[in-house]
């Protein structure tokens, strides 16, 4: 049985020279229309009969596919919404900078970042809550922040609160501009579909403009503003005495005093004598021992190099001049011995299905965000970031969660593409078709891998718990008994530690101190970073990571590959992206929609990321973070207990969760007490989710009808008829509170602990 999706409006361009790319005044600006709730849907616009109406209103407001099937109109709405999103981002950034200007101890921190903690929030003395204003040093009382903004401001060369005010106002102006642009490009000059589908032009502009010129302008700012200002700060000059940014930009002699090559201007550039610039464009590797961050001259060099690459990349694609790559040609030439037609037809998919496009972008951005999390601690980019343990832990945790959500989003939109945009009648023997035809083999093999990893990884722990319980430490898997050393990881560490002098002859240290070989870097008697030893304990928990990630992928991929049909429900595509069951009279067909796979995938994503951040938090406290005395002896926060304690489940519960929860549990009466309240409240939110996840719709409908009866008795019954949440709505509310409660609990646990001991 072939299920046809509605035909999308395809308009692939033959002639690249398109003249008029916008429609003028396509849709009038109508406040009357906006004031009508649900104006985008005939059904919802009629107003509420039952309380389900408010749920449908929220579910469909941004589901532009449900408003119209016209791809051009959908594209315009998405484009306009992007400007709204940018406006919110600028507004948020403005708020951050304003807090730094108005409520923070930034200038004091700048003078003494090793003894003063960053704070940008002071609680008003209402009901005694001023207890939350802890002493962060230098006589300032406020809430310690862990966002890393102070470090990034210092790296940018911001030396006063006035500069923060100006930036905050600038961001507000940009927020207004973005709002205007969102309105203008939907109501006044809306791009045609052809403009959205002109991928070569888009690639050229994004690569050369956003990434190329963006990196180049940041490199320019670093060289002309950040480097000299940080040079002065590092030398102990009072921030008020340092020349202002524009003085460095306008007066070359000022820069030449710090970096002699500036005296020669652009001559070395045009005479190809580039090594002259090595005083401010370096290739050192390792960390600046003064600040514990990457060398800012290395970072400037990096952005200059990246800019060149992206500027070249932005000239590679064929637009009006008949030279360069065409994406369609590249994709259609992409065939292998086992891939049939290869990527034939993929160009049409990616230019007519924004869900398919978004799915790929989310998968890549999610992976990249997780890569950022790994690099923020192993290559700390900003001055004094590495010794601010609370910020390090927060940045790692934040980027891991964000990456996890983005990757689940990738699966969600891939499934929506399969249901709404995929047309099986036009796709034959291309890569996607071939994947779909052997999906049973893929999923069953992946399932086998999950079972194997699950039993073996947990089996190793259970073995250790059993041996430990029976008093047989000599029979445990550990660094002191039966060793399971991560030899491949150790080999990679060693290879990178040896790289300076061989693969990178100019570098004096490896890319990251964590590889080994180097000495530790300490700032103000606190460890910034040192070689991280890997042993049996890491080998065990890494296999738990492998297990949880593979199960997440199994659930999400099954949802995508079986989104349109399965043996159980051959006509699944007709039921849509989310549905509770395959109608009455077909038992055992509930919770099979693509949406339900996303729902289940979220729980396993939560499992995966939780284990990762727990591993990171304990490993760093045990083997990296700590203090160093004058004799060079390092005392770690948990005294290196990870290797011996984390090899049993009991050890994780006793020496990590319970032992490190003491700070949050005992926080009442101290400046950390808000975390104690959050810890309690977030546990409650998490438990509240179970009420939605464990009970059925009928239970609530019965309860509601009793309550409505009571209201009728008292003649206070509402006109809108109350309804229980649908099955899908209940699960959505459940998973939202589960994740919100779980993440906020972890946040309170981590921060109370690390602010107290870090």
Curated annotation (Swiss-Prot):
Q: What keywords are assigned to this protein?
A: 4Fe-4S, Chlorophyll, Chloroplast, Chromophore, Electron transport, Iron, Iron-sulfur, Magnesium, Membrane, Metal-binding, Oxidoreductase, Photosynthesis, Photosystem I, Plastid, Thylakoid, Transmembrane, Transmembrane helix, Transport
Q: Which GO terms describe its cellular component?
A: chloroplast thylakoid membrane; photosystem I
State the disulfide connectivity: none
Binding of [4Fe-4S] cluster occurs at 581, 590
* Binding locations of chlorophyll a': 683
Which GO molecular function annotations are given, in alphabetical order? 4 iron, 4 sulfur cluster binding; chlorophyll binding; electron transfer activity; magnesium ion binding; oxidoreductase activity
Give me any GO biological process, just one. Answer: photosynthesis
Enzyme Commission (EC) number: 1.97.1.12
Identify the residues that bind chlorophyll a: 691, 699
Xref: InterPro entries: PSI_PsaA, PSI_PsaA/B, PSI_PsaA/B_CS, PSI_PsaA/B_sf
Q: Name one Pfam family in it.
A: PsaA_PsaB
PROSITE patterns given in the database record? PHOTOSYSTEM_I_PSAAB (PS00419)
- State the function annotated in the UniProt record: PsaA and PsaB bind P700, the primary electron donor of photosystem I (PSI), as well as the electron acceptors A0, A1 and FX. PSI is a plastocyanin-ferredoxin oxidoreductase, converting photonic excitation into a charge separation, which transfers an electron from the donor P700 chlorophyll pair to the spectroscopically characterized acceptors A0, A1, FX, FA and FB in turn. Oxidized P700 is reduced on the lumenal side of the thylakoid membrane by plastocyanin.
Q: How the protein assembles, per its UniProt entry? A: The PsaA/B heterodimer binds the P700 chlorophyll special pair and subsequent electron acceptors. PSI consists of a core antenna complex that captures photons, and an electron transfer chain that converts photonic excitation into a charge separation. The eukaryotic PSI reaction center is composed of at least 11 subunits.
**What is this protein's record name?**
Photosystem I P700 chlorophyll a apoprotein A1
Gene encoding it? psaA
